[in-house]
Amino acid sequence: MRTWKNGILLPFLLVLLWYIISKLQIFSSYLLPSPAATAITAGELIRSGMLWQHLLISLQRVAGGFLCSVVVALPLGILCGRSNSFQSYCWPILEFLRHVPPLAAIPLIILWFGIDEGSKLVIIFLASFFPLFLNTYSGIKGCDRKLLEVGRSLHFTAWQQARLIQLPAALPAIAVGLQLSLGYSWRALIGAELIAASSGIGYMILDAEQMSRPDIVLVGCLLYTSDAADE
């Protein structure tokens, strides 16, 4: 209970500061709408269905890119953690790609995959792949050697060692990797939708900026923040 109360203290203070600034008119209402005006706009977007429509599309993109990274990163992390020879082949290219920010590769991704959904999924995939891969790899690699010796003494096959010993030992690291990957998926979604999209929360923010609707921009930003905080 105490942790929960501490968690809402800072957001409450920020909203209070926002209210005071808007009440004192330090900035014009055009530049910084009040919390009440923003809440009214959010209600209108919910009633019209526009907010749900854009949110659903954004959720689908995050889910698609995240699931693709899980399908690729988990087995690749397990293989690299178990096999030094396999790791020696994969590690140089993975180490190179790891230091390339996904948003920096957006022009090349758009050139290769166009501006449809494929490019957005690739951006989210690249952002969420390495946290899960590296945590899976370190979890498998860090398995207690004594447990592996026990498996060998019981004549476990390589598959049995991975399934019965290494995977259970790596589960905490994999869980952390999944959480980090999901957070990075949301961060990458913001860049992907702001640059090349005709729908989604990022598109709604960009369209509102062009239409001079800072209240809608704030609703979209708060929605991004709340979704990321939930993860």
Segments (PLM) and residue ranges:
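Hydrophobic alpha-helical transmembrane segments of multipass integral membrane proteins
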Residues: L9, L13-L17, W52, L56-C80, ...
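Transmembrane alpha-helices
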Residues: V122, L126, W159-I190, L218
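Periplasmic/extracellular loop-to-transmembrane helix junction in inner-membrane transport proteins
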Residues: M1, L24-L67
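Loop-to-helix entry region at the N-terminal start of transmembrane alpha-helices
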Residues: Q53-R61, L111-L132, A170, A175, ...
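Conserved small/polar residues in nucleotide/adenosyl-binding loops
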Residues: Y224-E231
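Short cytoplasmic-facing helical segments at TM-TM junctions of multi-pass membrane proteins
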Residues: N135, G139-G177
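Glycine-rich helix-loop "coupling/hinge" segments at transmembrane-helix boundaries
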Residues: L111, I140, R187-V219, L223
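Cytoplasmic-entry segments and transmembrane alpha-helices of multi-pass inner-membrane transporters
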Residues: L74-I110, I124, L134-S138, C143, ...
